[in-house]
Amino acid sequence: LPHGRLNALILPHVIHFNAADGTAAEKYGRLAKLCGLAANPRSLAAGLNRLRAQLKLPERLSACGVEGKELTAALDGLAEAAQADLCAPSNPRPAAAEDLKSLLRELA
């Protein structure tokens, strides 16, 4: 799955996850306002979902050819790789392996 396509799918979910951090929520709200949306993380995520739909990008991994069984089999490795990524420590909210698996399951 291309990196950009996966980002288009997962970014709204990541915004919801990170918005539990007050500082991140505030920054997402400012970004939403700059985009002409209501100044909150939910509006930003919804706006990204609308943009994804306008670009005719898929909403689910299954629409990209990733089957549920395939995803389930890969979850542990994907979560481990995400936690090992050099960018992971800079995420506004620490993500445990189960958090990452949950985000991916939301995309199934």
Predicted stretch roles:
Residues L1-A73:
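Gly/Pro-rich interdomain helix-loop hinge
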